[in-house]
């Protein structure tokens, strides 16, 4: 079986970190031991610096929405070209904490950047490159932010008002419902049930991939 790129997506507080661990463990149980884990924005020395610019406050200067978008895509290109593609070429599976779907939801939905801009930039940065499987953890923004606040201090994006996250979720749902490579998981359930759903979805997908 060729190496695959699997991504975990969702709003703040959806449980992505736990989901990633479940995915990695399930892959290992299926004899897949060579796994590279990534996060976005970030994942390379330069991309982590760009991540800090996106996440941190900038007193006295407003970070423009389009600037935020360009920073995120710059970080993504660095990660895809320097880490993800080389790992896949070596036969390593890649499990990512966020990818392009996050930009479509947060900047396209939350920031309301024009769809034409989003599509053009995506095409320029990524071309036809996309994950083989995306597990989207769906959660009501209010519950997600409640969980996120429980983790401690919020970053610049996590401090956005609830309407921002409602728009982001709406876009997430549009994308999830229009792409067969996206599997939606109800992240409002207990951690035990979410874990079971992730394992089942991944196992079903692996069975299909093995048959091809």
From Swiss-Prot:
Disulfide bonds: none annotated. HAMAP family: Thymidylate_kinase (MF_00165). This is Thymidylate kinase. InterPro entries: P-loop_NTPase, Thymidylate_kin-like_dom, Thymidylate_kin_CS, Thymidylate_kinase. Gene3D superfamilies: P-loop containing nucleotide triphosphate hydrolases. The lineage of its organism: Bacteria, Pseudomonadati, Pseudomonadota, Gammaproteobacteria, Vibrionales. Its EC number is 2.7.4.9. GO terms for cellular component: cytoplasm; cytosol. Belongs to the thymidylate kinase family. GO terms for biological process: dTDP biosynthetic process; dTTP biosynthetic process; dUDP biosynthetic process. Phosphorylation of dTMP to form dTDP in both de novo and salvage pathways of dTTP synthesis. The keyword Phosphoprotein does not apply. It catalyses: dTMP + ATP = dTDP + ADP. Pfam families: Thymidylate_kin. The gene is tmk. One of its GO terms (molecular function) is dTMP kinase activity. Keywords: ATP-binding, Kinase, Nucleotide biosynthesis, Nucleotide-binding, Transferase. CDD domains: TMPK. It comes from the Bacteria.
């Amino acid at each position: 079986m060729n190496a695959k790129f699997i991504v975990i997506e969702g709003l703040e507080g959806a449980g992505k970190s736990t989901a990633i661990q479940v995915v990695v463990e399930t892959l290992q149980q299926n004899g897949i031991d060579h796994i590279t884990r990534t996060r976005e924005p970030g994942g390379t020395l330069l991309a982590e610096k760009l991540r800090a610019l996106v996440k941190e406050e900038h007193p006295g200067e407003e970070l423009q929405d389009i600037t935020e978008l360009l920073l995120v895509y710059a970080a993504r290109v660095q990660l895809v070209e320097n880490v993800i593609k080389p790992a896949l070429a070596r036969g390593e599976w890649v499990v990512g904490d966020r990818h392009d779907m996050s930009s479509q939801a947060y900047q396209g939905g939350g920031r309301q950047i024009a769809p034409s801009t989003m599509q053009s930039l995506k095409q320029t940065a990524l071309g036809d490159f996309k994950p083989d499987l995306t597990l989207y953890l769906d959660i009501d923004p209010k519950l997600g932010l409640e969980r996120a606040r429980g983790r401690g201090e919020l970053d610049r994006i996590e401090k956005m008002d609830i309407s921002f996250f409602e728009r982001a979720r709406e876009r997430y749902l549009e994308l999830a419902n229009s792409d067969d490579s996206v599997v939606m998981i109800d992240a409002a359930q207990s951690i035990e049930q979410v874990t079971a759903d992730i394992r089942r979805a991944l196992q079903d997908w692996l069975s299909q991939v093995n048959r091809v």
